[in-house]
Structures are given as structure tokens and as C-alpha cells.
């Protein structure tokens, strides 16, 4: 196991999330400090009158839920869509909630899936992102709803959080809050927590026998369960079950592409948006069974001892799982900006991700091909320019050249740096270095859009978010997750990252309108800003910036250097 691989096993959850999209620069570190205390979930409430009237009670098939009204928005947090997944339910498919008699108090966010929390991160990055880790439990199958009214029939926007398949939650970033979309864009906003890491993607099929056939993908079948809950109940919250859009960023985008290829999700999705993610690493069933066997061996357990595993403390489980994966996986030296190998003929790395089991998941969706099963679902897909922003990385040009040369050779590194400097003469070297991952992400967007187009069915729309934040002297650029503040219309809540400037507010209004229009109609255009579907010959792309515009394949000449 390489030193690089060993080091990666000890990364904080925030570093791991960002390294999945970064160049992997190891240059001079910025001052690091303990992350901010995570007991501030309610600190970002939009100003407005808050009340708990009897009118803020809605029906579900399991019983009534009581929410509150904040600034005119009916808000319900932590509604159960499944039972506790701990103990004997660990690695079993989600079970429907048990009915309740009195109104359920849907007043605070539900628990997150158990996960390794961050301990240290760059102070500046903590400031820009403003994370909230909340609290954790295996009783985490909960969803949140924001709606303008409990009557009517509005488009429904269901958001799946990022963090790969191991970290994150429905409320870890202030951008995830849905009141603004309900208040100003007349949609029903939903967000979801589900099982992650070893709790969501461990193959117990040969350990526990019957009933555990879907264990390796329960993190994904949880999401299907949440979408079924939406179909059965969202009408009681003013939503239209026939206009359900799913969307996600980073790992959430990969969840979206996986769902688009899952037979059990057919008919539950009517639009989809994939943001700075999608496709990616999906191991085979054989690989995941090998990993499970190694975990049992390392723990010193008999091969069929599911009972001990279900009683085991989670941190011990995840430590054993990570150690087993490190033993099985070959060292990865490709550079984080390109991610693990993917595409036809590639060999996936094992870990806590969905598995190609031939039942729940039977294809590498948007990797080998776009799924025929969802060909009639319009897709919106895009990325940001500085996907690789990691504030602790501050290279000189010479250091940057050395790093790139080690990954792609000196000739290509020289050509790439020269092309990026020419294309963006006003950007600092530090900001340009963050943009290499953005070019790689653009390549992936282009490929996924091409696969969708080749189905010759529903359209695909591309975007490229390039708005440069003015905060901290502007060096962070348009970082991984930056667009979320805008497509959720949350520049005020995210003012540490956006400055909530007049330019930011204007852009947010346009982007949130586009996302809401897409949810309603499958077309993100709006008056004065027509968004043309993409085709492989032209790569039509909406560029989101202070001057929003359509361009054919932006950054094409620069990004193609990566493919040469």
C-alpha cells in the first residue's frame, strides 16, 4: 500500500469529499484549525414570522405530521419514511414506518447517517462552506418538506446530498434549505437522509443469507423508498406526484444517475439534474463479496455471523471496512482530478458505493451508456469551473507545473498551464490550479450528455457555472458546491460564500427560476434567457455568470488537452 494510499485513509471527511474532485495538490498548507461546533442547525433561518398553527398539520398514510409556518412557508422536518435501520434491521431493505396516533412533531431535522466527522479543515474553507454536521443515528430515514401551501398541485424538487456515498446530510450546507424555492418559485422542496458508507453498501448476502440479497445497495433502495413515499403522500403537501424532479450535487449527482438506471425507480422520476457528479465507480458483486469476506476475516468472525455484525459499534465496523478495502484495492496513482477509473473496460475499486449486483443495479448508468429505462426523462447536467478548490493548496506556478508533470508528463503540463493562463489572464495561479479538476469535470459532463443524446428521446441540457465569489480576495473561484447557493436561491443564507451581493442575488434569481421551470415543464428556459438542448456536435451550454449566455462547448480547446 503506497504512502499516498495510507495517508488517504486518515483524511477528514471534508478533505476526502474535496479530494474526490481536486487535483490532489499537496502544497503549502494554510493554517488549519478545529472545525466549528456543529450545533447550529437552526442558525440560518430566513427572517420572517414563525408560528405553529393548526393549519400546519398534514396527512400521511402513516399518520398526521405537525410542522410550522416560517415566513409564509409550511415547513416539515424529519418526517419518517422508514423505520430505524439499527440492530436487526441493519442491512435489510427499509421498512415502512409504523403508524402513529398523535400528530408527529416534524419540527427539527432528523439524524444523519453515522459517519466520520471532520476534525480539522482550512479555516477559510470552513468559512466559505459553513458546514453543519448535525447529529447522528441509525434512525435516519427522514425527509424534509417546504411548501407554499398544503393544497394545489406543484412541481416537486427532491434533493439528494453530496459527500460521495459515505458522508453528508440533507442539511449539512446552508444552501440545502428549501424555503426560498417554496416562497419565491412556487415548488414543493424535499430533501432526504439515507444510509451511507458501510451501513448502506456492505454485501451481507452470503453472511446473513435470505433477506440480505439487497444489502449491498440498501443506501440506494432507501432513496427509492423516499421517492415512493413522495408518490404516496406529496399530494397532501401541495405537490404533484406526476412532476417529480430529482437532483443532486457531487455524490448526490452520482445517486441521481444510478437511480435513472434502477428498475425499481422507474416511473418515480420525471426530471433529473446531475451537478458536478454522475456515473463513476461501481464495483461488481464479486468484488463487493470479496470485500465483505475480508472484513469478516479481519474482525475474526465466522463467515455467517450476521448477529455480531448487527450489534457491533459503528466506528469499529467502518475502521475494519476501510482497512479491508485498502488491502484489496491496488494503489491509485492517477491524480484526484480524474477520479477512480471509469468507463468501458475499466476495473472499479471496491469501497462503500453502489454495486453492480444484477438486480437492484444492473448497469453502470451514464458510464457505459445512458439508461434506456429512463430515456423519456429530461436531464440537466453541469459543473463548476474550480471543482478542485482546496483552500489549503496554494502552489507557485513552478510547484503546480511539477505536480501536473508527475500526473500527465511535462509536455502536456506545460501546454495546459499556458492554455489556462491565456484563457483566464485575470485569475491567480492558485485559482487556475483549482480549475484543472473543473476541466476534467467538463469532459465528464460532455460525455454523459452525449450518452443521453444518443437515446434520441428526452432532451439533455448542459450548464457551466463560472461565477467568481468575491469573498477572501476571490481566490476560491467557483468551487465544488458553489452553484447550490444559486439554484436554491439561498445567497443570503450562504453569504459567507457569496457575499450576498446584488450580482449574486440577480444570478440566483435566474438560476433558481431555471431549475424550477425545469421541474415544472422539463424545459429550463425563461423569458429573456432561452436554454437550448445540447447535442454532441455543438455542446450547447448555459454559462452561469454575471452575464448569463449560451455557448457552444465552453473551454473546449483547453479541456481537450486533458484528452490528448
What are these language model-derived features?
Residues 17, 157, 224-227, 231, ...:
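Non-transmembrane alpha-helical segments in soluble domains
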Residues 124-306, 363, 367-392, 457:
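Serine-hydrolase-like catalytic core of hydrolytic proteins
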Residues 1-15, 22-23:
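N-terminal secretory signal peptides
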Amino acid at each position: 500500500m503506497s504512502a499516498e494510499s495510507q495517508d488517504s485513509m486518515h483524511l477528514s471527511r471534508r478533505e476526502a469529499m474535496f479530494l474526490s474532485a481536486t487535483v490532489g495538490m499537496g502544497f503549502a498548507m494554510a493554517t488549519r484549525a478545529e472545525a466549528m461546533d456543529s450545533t447550529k442547525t437552526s442558525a440560518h433561518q430566513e427572517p420572517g414570522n414563525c408560528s405553529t398553527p393548526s393549519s400546519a398539520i398534514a396527512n400521511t398514510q402513516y399518520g398526521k405530521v405537525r410542522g410550522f409556518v416560517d415566513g409564509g412557508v409550511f415547513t416539515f422536518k424529519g418526517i419518517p419514511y422508514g423505520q430505524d435501520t439499527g440492530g436487526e434491521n441493519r442491512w435489510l431493505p427499509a421498512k415502512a414506518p409504523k403508524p402513529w396516533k398523535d400528530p408527529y412533531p416534524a419540527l427539527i431535522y432528523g439524524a444523519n447517517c453515522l459517519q466520520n466527522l471532520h476534525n480539522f479543515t482550512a479555516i477559510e474553507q470552513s468559512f466559505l462552506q459553513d458546514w453543519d454536521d448535525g447529529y447522528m443515528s441509525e434512525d435516519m430515514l427522514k425527509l424534509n418538506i417546504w411548501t407554499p401551501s398544503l393544497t394545489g398541485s406543484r412541481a416537486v424538487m427532491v434533493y439528494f446530498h453530496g459527500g460521495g456515498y459515505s458522508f453528508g446530510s440533507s442539511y449539512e450546507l446552508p444552501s440545502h434549505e428549501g424555503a426560498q424555492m417554496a416562497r419565491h418559485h412556487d415548488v414543493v422542496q424535499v430533501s432526504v437522509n439515507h444510509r451511507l458508507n458501510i451501513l448502506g453498501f456492505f454485501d451481507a448476502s452470503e453472511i446473513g443469507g435470505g433477506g440480505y440479497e439487497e444489502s449491498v445497495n440498501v443506501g440506494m433502495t432507501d432513496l427509492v423508498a423516499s421517492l415512493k413515499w413522495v408518490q404516496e403522500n406529496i399530494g397532501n403537501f401541495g405537490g404533484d406526484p406526476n412532476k417529480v424532479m430529482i437532483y443532486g450535487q457531487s455524490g448526490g449527482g452520482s445517486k441521481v444517475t444510478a437511480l435513472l438506471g434502477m428498475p425499481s425507480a422507474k416511473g418515480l422520476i420525471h426530471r433529473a439534474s446531475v451537478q458536478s457528479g454522475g456515473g463513476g465507480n461501481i464495483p461488481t458483486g464479486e468484488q463487493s463479496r470479496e470485500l465483505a469476506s475480508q472484513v469478516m476475516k479481519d474482525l475474526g468472525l465466522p463467515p455467517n455471523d450476521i448477529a455480531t455484525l448487527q450489534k457491533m459499534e459503528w466506528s469499529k465496523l467502518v475502521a475494519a471496512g476501510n482497512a479491508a478495502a485498502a488491502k484489496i484495492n491496488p494503489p491509485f496513482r492517477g491524480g484526484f482530478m480524474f477520479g477512480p477509473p471509469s468507463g468501458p473496460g475499466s476495473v472499479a475499486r471496491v469501497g462503500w458505493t453502489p454495486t453492480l449486483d444484477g438486480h437492484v443495479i444492473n448497469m453502470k448508468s451514464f458510464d457505459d451508456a445512458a439508461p434506456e429505462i429512463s430515456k423519456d426523462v429530461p436531464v440537466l447536467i453541469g459543473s463548476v469551473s474550480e471543482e478542485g478548490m482546496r483552500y489549503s493548496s496554494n502552489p507557485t506556478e513552478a510547484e503546480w507545473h511539477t505536480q501536473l508533470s508527475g500526473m500527465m508528463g511535462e509536455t502536456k503540463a506545460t501546454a495546459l498551464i499556458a492554455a489556462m493562463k491565456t484563457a483566464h489572464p485575470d485569475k491567480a495561479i492558485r485559482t487556475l490550479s483549482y480549475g484543472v479538476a473543473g476541466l476534467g469535470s467538463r469532459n465528464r459532463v460532455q460525455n454523459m450528455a452525449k450518452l443521453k443524446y444518443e437515446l434520441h428521446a428526452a432532451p439533455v441540457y448542459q450548464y457551466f457555472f463560472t461565477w467568481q465569489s468575491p469573498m477572501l480576495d476571490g481566490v476560491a473561484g467557483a468551487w465544488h458546491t458553489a452553484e447550490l447557493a444559486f439554484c436554491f436561491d439561498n445567497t443570503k443564507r450562504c453569504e459567507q460564500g457569496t457575499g450576498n451581493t446584488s450580482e449574486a442575488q440577480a444570478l440566483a434569481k435566474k438560476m433558481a427560476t431555471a431549475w424550477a421551470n425545469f421541474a415544472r415543464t422539463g424545459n429550463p428556459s425563461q423569458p429573456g434567457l432561452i436554454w437550448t438542448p445540447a447535442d454532441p456536435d455543438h455542446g450547447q451550454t448555459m454559462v452561469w455568470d454575471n452575464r448569463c449566455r449560451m455557448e457552444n462547448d465552453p473551454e473546449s480547446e483547453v479541456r481537450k488537452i486533458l484528452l490528448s
